[in-house]
Amino acid sequence: MFKTILLAYDGSDHAKRAAAVAKAEAQAHGARLLVVHAYEPVPDYLGEPFFEEALKRRLERAEKVRAEAMALTGVPREDALLLQGRPAEAILQAAIGEKADLIVMGTRGLGAVGSLFLGSQSQKVVAEAPCPVLLVR
């Protein structure tokens, strides 16, 4: 049924659980598993040398998150994408570009009441995705 499954991964506990689900779904369907980690762009107004330092730190963090996702899912580096941009937009663009049949991602609830609500990124992806979205908490 699914040929390409996209895992949106940010390193959170929800994302770690989503990684296990995405890996199992990919194995069950014989599908390609693609991992996407999006990181926010560094604001231009920081100026030099602050911009370069902030960008370096952001990229280092993104690489660590990607390495963690690769370790959890077993995907090769070429299937673990780092994308700069707002997370929901980057996930949606990757889903379109890679022709994903399913997006798997974590929700982000905080506390007893917060767990009833989706995070803003999850809401946007669910509302605009070109394919089904599986949310994991």
Curated annotation (Swiss-Prot):
Domain of life: Bacteria
Record SUPFAM superfamilies: Adenine nucleotide alpha hydrolases-like
Listed PANTHER family: STRESS RESPONSE PROTEIN NHAX, UNIVERSAL STRESS PROTEIN UP12
UniProt record similarity statement: Belongs to the universal stress protein A family.
Protein name per the record: Universal stress protein in QAH/OAS sulfhydrylase 3'region
Species assigned in the record: Thermus aquaticus
